Design a protein with these regions (language model features):
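Short, solvent-exposed loop/turn positions at domain surfaces
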Residues: 21-22, 88, 127, 174, ...
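Short amphipathic alpha-helical signal-transduction/dimerization elements
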Residues: 75-83, 274-282
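Active-site/binding-pocket entry motifs
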Residues: 9-12, 41, 59, 193-196, ...
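A short glycine-rich beta-alpha junction/loop motif
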Residues: 51-58, 75, 88-110, 248-256, ...
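A short beta-sheet element
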Residues: 5, 24-76, 189, 211-213, ...
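Non-catalytic DNA-recognition/assembly elements of restriction-modification systems
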Residues: 9-11, 101-116, 128-173, 182-184, ...
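Sequence-specific dsDNA recognition surfaces
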Residues: 2-30, 164-179, 193-225
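ATP/adenylate-binding site constellation spanning eukaryotic-like Ser/Thr protein kinases
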Residues: 6, 96, 141, 160, ...
């Protein structure tokens, strides 16, 4: 029988099994509400395959006066409040005592169902937009393979060059914690770079002074439009092609910087080449025990296809068309997410 661990709660299935005897009351069924009680306090509906409750996983069984879907939408608000108040050492822990103290606004059942139905419809629209983005990403991947083949196996037998032969590969100059400010020039970490790679709006949380920024630029230069930046922990290939002239700086080591030096390469082609290399062969490129990280020396050695620039430019034109579609979908998705936040605030405070 599958055994539910905390990591399984959100995804709704388990790949861990037990042969021990169990009581029927510990069996979790489809759509049962579960909460992970360590780390991030997530609530989710369980998937189709029955499984067993495990330690640090809590099942919620609402009473007759509470609609299950209403409870599902209310609980993230309550859990977030508890999480914010919970002391952080290494991993946050949620206690049964704290759960039992949660006060749930008990509205008439019909009203509860109406609230849950409204939020469910918004969730369906959000999921649809996310599926559209995923399909557009698949379209790009298919087009790349069609034109150039898989970067790992090179079925078209392109000649290759090490990345360091066509680009400068490095990072930034170190900025110390005490040098960070509450305003000024935005300072991006891997988290923000990853979000920008996904074309999400980023609100900077950290800054450096303009004077400090100028000093850093004199020492290391600054990213230009068309340069590539990526988080050092990047198994999903989140690479940002710089698309702004606005000043910013970034964290050394945690963000890698690629600046093309060859006129025979297109930045868009290079982005998707590295994305393909990283996503299909991350284990052999990255290093580290806890979190495998991309290192500058390894990135320099990455092999890049030596293909005609005309072909690269054709691919870049295709990407431009797809990106316009993605931007439209992404804007719609962000509006839906804002709508859901507003509704959650209206319903649950």
């Amino acid at each position: 029988m599958p055994l539910i661990r905390i990591r399984d709660v959100v995804r709704g299935y388990s790949e861990t099994y037990t042969t021990e005897e169990y009581k029927s009351e510990y069996i979790v069924h489809e759509n049962d509400l579960l909460i992970g009680m360590d780390g991030e306090f997530n609530i989710a509906k369980w998937g189709k395959t029955p499984a067993l409750l495990n330690q640090r996983v809590c099942r919620l069984a609402p009473k007759d006066s509470i609609d299950k879907d209403y409870l599902f939408y209310f609980m993230p608000v309550a859990l977030k409040r508890i999480e914010e108040k919970t002391p952080f050492v290494t991993v946050k822990h949620l206690s049964a005592k704290e759960l039992n103290k949660i006060e749930i606004p008990v509205l008439p059942l019909e009203e509860q169902r109406k609230i849950a139905e409204t939020l469910s419809k918004v969730d369906e629209l959000i999921a649809f937009r996310e599926q559209q983005l995923a399909k557009l990403d698949e379209l790009v991947k298919a087009r790349f393979v069609e034109m150039f083949g898989d970067c790992k196996t090179n079925p078209k037998n392109w000649k290759t060059k090490a990345l360091e032969k066509i680009a400068n590969v490095g990072s930034s100059k170190r900025v110390f914690v005490e040098e960070l400010q509450d305003s000024g020039i935005p300072f991006y970490r891997g988290t923000e770079i990853g979000a920008l790679a996904e074309k999400k709006a980023v609100i900077p949380a950290l800054f450096i002074t303009e004077e400090h920024y100028k000093q850093l630029c004199e020492t290391t230069g600054k990213p230009q439009k068309g340069d590539l930046l990526m988080p050092s922990i990047c198994p999903d290939g989140r690479i940002w092609i710089v698309d702004t002239d606005e000043p910013f700086y970034f964290k050394d080591g945690r963000v890698l910087w690629v600046h093309l030096t060859s006129a025979n390469y297109n930045s868009v082609f290079l982005l998707y080449t590295l994305k393909d290399r990283i996503m299909t062969d991350y284990a052999s490129i990255a290093s580290g025990t806890t979190f495998a990280e991309l290192k500058i020396f390894a990135l320099k050695k990455c092999k890049v296809f030596d293909v005609p620039l005309e072909l690269q430019n054709q691919f870049a034109t295709f990407i431009e068309r797809v990106d316009r579609q993605k931007q439209t979908v992404q804007q719609s998705l962000e509006k839906l997410e804002l709508m859901k936040k507003a509704l959650m605030q209206e319903y649950f405070g």
